[in-house]
């Protein structure tokens, strides 16, 4: 897609498709503008291009822009670190039209578990009009810990992305994490 006619901007907020992502990233890189993206289903080459772009622009990519999910990432990483040897399973449920399975959020929760030393297994359910539910289970003989987040309204994702865009504007080039930007935020 040709985006050269797009007016000037401080931050691009992109929740499009993997096929449109390259043009948005190139526009931001060329203009030296920040990018907030929640586009999932990106290829390894697209993730590599995004990593290369952080040398010249600030980028925040997240699979989910909910403040609750940002906190859940931290809790999952900490639980994995504190519970070595426990099984880690991630169960995610979304509406029937969601195409990627496991979801980008489930995969990044798995990355958080891996940072803490756990290897996650995934189960995906597509049913009805569910906005998004993620449960991370840590289990061992005789006990289970379950960390869960349920989104009941899609507005939370837009609010989180706009908040992230305001905080990312003017930041130095680099890959920024949602949870770092939200750290000082109080609802």
Predicted regions and their residues:
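N-terminal glycine-/serine-/threonine-rich beta1-alpha1-beta2 phosphate-ribose binding loop
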Residues: 1-30
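Short loop or secondary-structure boundary microenvironments that flank
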Residues: 17, 39-40, 65, 95, ...
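Rossmann-fold NAD(P)-binding glycine/threonine-rich loop
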Residues: 19-31, 38-61, 67-79
């Amino acid at each position: 897609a040709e985006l050269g006619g797009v007016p000037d901007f401080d931050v691009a907020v992109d929740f499009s498709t993997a096929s449109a992502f390259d043009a948005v990233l190139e526009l931001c890189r060329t203009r030296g503008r920040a990018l907030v993206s929640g586009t999932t289903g990106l290829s390894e080459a697209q993730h590599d291009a995004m990593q290369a772009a952080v040398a010249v622009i600030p980028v925040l990519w997240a699979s989910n822009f909910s403040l609750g999910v940002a906190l859940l990432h931290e809790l999952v990483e900490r639980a994995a670190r504190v519970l070595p040897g426990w099984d880690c399973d991630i169960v995610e449920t979304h509406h029937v039209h969601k195409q990627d399975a496991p979801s980008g959020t489930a995969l990044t929760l798995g990355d958080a578990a891996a940072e803490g030393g756990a290897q996650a297994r995934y189960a995906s359910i597509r049913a009805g009009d569910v906005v998004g539910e993620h449960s991370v289970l840590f289990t061992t003989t005789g006990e289970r810990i379950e960390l869960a987040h349920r989104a009941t309204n899609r507005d939370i994702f837009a609010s989180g992305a706009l908040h992230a865009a305001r905080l990312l504007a003017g930041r130095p080039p680099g890959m920024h994490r949602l949870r770092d930007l939200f750290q000082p935020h109080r609802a």
